[in-house]
């Protein structure tokens, strides 16, 4: 109590240090020196973070997102109820543009809307309403459930919910080890457990644009998992060397 949150104290001293690493089997061999390591993927990493978080409100955000100022986030979740989840639409920005406008500065959250503006939510909106619950979902054909659960395109860059909500749905499905769709699936689980998803474009989040590999072998299959297929040890490394 009274201590500063660790992530509030993190600053990138030199933005030029941001690099792209191409992870290959040879690179992994070099880094690990051949030592067996626990299998890891995005969903497991997120779940480990959720299980280790200590607050009542847990925010899951991607590494390549510039989040809003803390005071804006604090205002956003004041009316968030247990069982519900908030997702924010992102706005893409180029790394070169960040360097051009800010150089090595890292305290830039308040300036982002001034420099880059704010996209209207319609730019990423997937359904014509900004919330979804189980009653509405069950009125839709099953083929539309994925779109209805997403609400906005790229819904998973910022999701916030009460700790009890994350634990009720057992986090992200840990068998979805590839790219895409696990964020929509976690929102589907919230909806089908009786909660609702609320989507907004405020406060504003900005995503550092990057290359993508959405080939079939790197992409999850769309699925709807409720109840969760995760076991009671979700969010832990189940691996013995």
Where are these regions (language model features)?
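C-terminal catalytic/acceptor-binding lobe
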Residues: 147-148, 153-155, 175-241
């Amino acid at each position: 109590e009274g201590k500063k949150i660790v992530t509030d104290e993190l600053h990138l001293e030199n933005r030029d240090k941001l690099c792209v690493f191409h992870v290959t089997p040879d690179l992994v061999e070099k880094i690990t020196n051949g030592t067996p390591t626990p299998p890891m993927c995005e969903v497991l990493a997120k779940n480990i973070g959720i299980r280790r978080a200590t607050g009542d409100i847990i925010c899951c955000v991607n590494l390549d997102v510039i989040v809003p100022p803390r005071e804006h986030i604090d205002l956003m979740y004041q009316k968030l109820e247990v069982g519900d989840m908030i997702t924010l639409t992102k706005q893409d920005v180029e790394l070169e543009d960040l360097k051009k406008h800010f150089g090595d500065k890292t305290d830039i959250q308040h300036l982002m809307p001034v420099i880059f503006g704010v996209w209207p939510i319609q730019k990423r909106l997937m359904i014509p309403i900004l919330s979804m619950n189980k009653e509405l979902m069950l009125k839709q054909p099953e083929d539309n459930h994925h779109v209805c659960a997403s609400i906005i395109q790229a819904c998973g860059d910022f999701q916030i919910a009460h700790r009890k909500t994350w634990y009720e749905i057992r986090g992200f499905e840990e068998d979805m080890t590839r790219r895409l769709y696990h964020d929509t699936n976690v929102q589907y689980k919230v909806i089908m457990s009786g909660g609702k998803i609320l989507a907004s474009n405020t406060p504003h989040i900005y995503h550092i644009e990057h290359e993508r590999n959405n080939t079939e072998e790197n992409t999850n299959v769309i699925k709807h998992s409720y109840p969760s297929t995760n076991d009671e040890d979700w969010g832990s490394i189940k691996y013995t060397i």
